[in-house]
């Protein structure tokens, strides 16, 4: 059998979890000596393709960490690291490990086999990961199909990861229209419409109106949600729309002349909703209020915080003016240490000091625990000499021009003062 003829079992049955296969090729992974790249005669593992993340699982007792199409061939990357063969702690592939009758941990129940060409292997996909991806992808099809039929926009970008699904559309959609599309998708989900997968002939395809992001060579696989979408797609899908569960728009933004919409479906949407509910409950407790008043409370808190920051800034500025006035006048150099001063204020202070002092004017803001940021200026001397001393003695970072340098140093005030005594 040619390596290009790997049978895609996931095309035949998207709900199959386990399978048998023969290893056609097994080569060390070039990037990691604990991993091998394996080609099979048939596979249930869907590779990263069409913007969707690949299936995970076990193969021959070892953990499958990646599935890619390399040189046109589905390639499974397995990790042979000791103790790392299971589906990330999934109960169905682990059992209790006992020592002298006592439970000491968990161990893999999958029997490991030799990884070599010609060896027969048993494979098992991570079903939860697969099904969650199926929910996302089927939901995306309905959303994109509705957008296409209502607005005529194309889905020009698609990415499905474990945390979010993003869709890039070729035109701008208003927030109100996005909300309407979301509602219509969930209506379609509630109808529990059977999803159809077909392989039309070239003649049938010529007369079929369908969405496709790219030009497809060879046999085209069509996924149809009757009444909502017809699209060329290579990925596994749920059997009916009801299995999607729900679709929720998480975010949207204008992007490259169109709009990028982020969604979650099914159990991933449920988990996101659960997290948001937990956050809302915590905020209700913090503000001692109901859900409807949270935004108002946060807005008031933000305004109060900004007011306090302004008052604090005014007080610090007055204190800084006082400290500057107290600096010795009969010296060439000026050095100030003050915590909580922003960079612009510190720079303005240094700019004022260089008009009064002929040597170096240095401002350090911070504390011994977190370290200090500094700005050093001079009209008559090269500030890089001071920066170099701080760098050589204390590992300071930064630099600049002879008239002014800026940087940071992780050291105590006393240590900085010792270095300054040597160079000022």
Region locations from a protein language model:
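A glycine- and charged-residue-rich anion-binding loop/surface
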Residues: 1-424
């Amino acid at each position: 059998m040619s390596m290009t003829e790997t049978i895609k079992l996931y095309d035949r049955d998207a709900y199959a979890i386990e399978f048998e296969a023969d290893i056609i090729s097994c080569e060390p992974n070039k990037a990691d000596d604990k991993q091998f790249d394996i080609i099979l005669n048939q596979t249930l593992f869907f590779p990263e393709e069409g913007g969707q993340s690949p299936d995970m699982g076990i193969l021959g007792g070892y953990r499958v960490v990646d599935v890619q199409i390399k040189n046109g061939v589905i390639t499974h990357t397995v990790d042979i690291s000791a103790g790392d063969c299971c589906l990330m702690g999934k109960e169905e592939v682990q059992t209790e490990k006992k020592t002298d009758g006592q439970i000491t941990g968990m161990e893999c129940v999958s029997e490991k086999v030799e990884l070599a060409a010609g060896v027969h292997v048993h494979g098992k996909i991570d079903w939860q990961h697969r099904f969650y991806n199926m929910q996302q992808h089927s939901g995306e099809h309905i959303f994109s199909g509705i957008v296409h039929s209502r607005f005529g926009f194309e889905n020009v970008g698609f990415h499905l990861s474990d945390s979010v699904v993003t869709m890039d559309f070729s035109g701008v959609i208003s927030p109100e229209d996005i909300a309407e599309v979301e509602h219509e998708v969930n209506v379609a989900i509630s109808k529990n419409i059977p999803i159809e997968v077909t392989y039309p002939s070239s003649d049938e395809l010529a007369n079929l109106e369908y969405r496709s992001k790219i030009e497809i060579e060879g046999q085209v696989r069509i996924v149809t949600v009757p009444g909502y979408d017809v699209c060329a797609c290579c990925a596994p899908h749920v059997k009916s729309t009801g299995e999607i569960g729900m679709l929720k728009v998480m975010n949207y933004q204008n992007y490259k002349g169109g709009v990028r919409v982020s969604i979650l479906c099914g159990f991933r949407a449920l988990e996101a909703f659960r997290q948001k509910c937990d956050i809302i409950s915590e905020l209700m407790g913090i503000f001692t209020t109901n859900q409807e008043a949270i935004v108002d409370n946060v807005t008031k808190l933000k305004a109060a915080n900004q007011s306090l920051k302004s008052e604090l800034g005014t007080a610090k500025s007055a204190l800084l003016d006082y400290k500057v006035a107290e600096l010795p006048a009969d010296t060439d150099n000026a050095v100030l240490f003050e915590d909580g001063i922003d960079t612009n204020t510190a720079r303005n202070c240094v700019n004022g000091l260089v008009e009064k002092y002929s040597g170096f004017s240095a401002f350090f803001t911070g504390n011994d625990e977190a370290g200090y940021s500094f700005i050093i200026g001079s009209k008559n001397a090269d500030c890089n000499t001071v920066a170099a001393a701080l760098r050589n003695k204390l590992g300071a970072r930064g630099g600049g021009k002879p008239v002014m340098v800026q940087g940071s140093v992780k050291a105590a005030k006393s240590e900085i003062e010792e270095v300054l005594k040597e160079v000022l």
